[in-house]
């Protein structure tokens, strides 16, 4: 009876894996795709890179980069450009705060303005980028209202300065991640599979969750599991 029950469970598991084979994992191409620490958006034609160990949330209205323990965050939003002006002029219309350490520059070949902004007792790292009649606004601050912004500004700048058009070789990275069946080989572990996985932010935990092995379940050789490609 135990043998029959085990065979039945294995059969049900394999049927389930067949049904979910090829299902989308995470975001759609329309929303943009997160792979490892990269964000790729086909329609907007942009790529951004997150600092190591930062989480990235892709919401309907913005992309949010979050530092460990939520101590800082940088939000990226997009709007249509309706006036003929510079990024600096655009920001000056939006805020009456004080800007300093400012500069006009090119980011990924596009007109941009980079500054620190002090407004309503909060210090923020702000960048405005004009690209193809769209305005990309980067707004970074900290849990302490920017009083400790120096601790995170290098990471804010690394995100902002990673902004550029997609390369031809990156177009395939805008395709959504898919769930695939995988037969566990000798020597496999969740740790080794996570190193090869495109899942962004803590792929080992997410693979464990996907397979019901969170937090510390082990893999069995020849077992079929779900991975993401």
Predicted regions and their residues:
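Pan-zinc metallopeptidase signature
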Residues: 1-45, 169-173
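Short, hydrophobic/aromatic-rich segments at coil-to-beta transitions
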Residues: 33-39, 62-63, 107-116
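Secretory pathway targeting signatures of secreted, lumenal, and periplasmic proteins
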Residues: 47-93, 117-121
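Surface-exposed amphipathic alpha-helical segments
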Residues: 54, 140-178
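Short, well-ordered beta-strand elements
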Residues: 75-78, 134-146
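Signature of long, low-cysteine stretches enriched in small and polar/charged residues
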Residues: 92-137
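Primarily a LysM-type cell-wall glycan-binding module
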Residues: 170-201, 223
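Extracellular LysM carbohydrate-binding repeats and other cell-envelope/extracellular binding modules
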Residues: 201-229
């Amino acid at each position: 009876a135990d043998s029959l029950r085990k065979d039945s469970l294995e059969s049900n598991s394999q049927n389930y894996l067949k049904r979910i084979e090829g299902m989308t994992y995470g975001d759609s191409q329309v929303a943009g795709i997160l792979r490892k620490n990269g964000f790729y958006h086909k329609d907007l034609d942009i790529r951004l890179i997150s600092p190591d160990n930062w989480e990235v949330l892709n919401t309907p209205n913005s992309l949010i980069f979050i530092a460990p323990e939520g101590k800082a965050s940088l939000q990226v939003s997009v709007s249509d450009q309706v006036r003929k002006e510079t990024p600096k002029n655009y920001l000056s219309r939006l805020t009456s705060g004080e800007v300093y350490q400012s500069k006009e520059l090119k980011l990924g070949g596009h007109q941009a303005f980079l500054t620190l902004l002090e407004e309503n007792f909060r210090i923020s790292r702000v960048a405005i980028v004009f690209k193809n009649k769209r305005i990309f606004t980067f707004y970074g601050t900290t849990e302490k209202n920017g009083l400790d912004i120096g601790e995170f500004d290098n990471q804010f700048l690394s995100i902002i300065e990673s902004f550029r058009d997609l390369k031809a070789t990156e177009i395939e990275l805008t395709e959504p991640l898919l769930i695939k069946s995988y037969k566990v080989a000798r020597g496999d572990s969740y740790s080794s599979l996570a190193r090869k996985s495109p899942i962004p932010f803590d792929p080992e935990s997410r693979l464990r969750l996907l397979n019901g092995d969170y937090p510390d379940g082990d893999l069995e050789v020849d077992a079929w599991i779900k991975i993401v490609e």
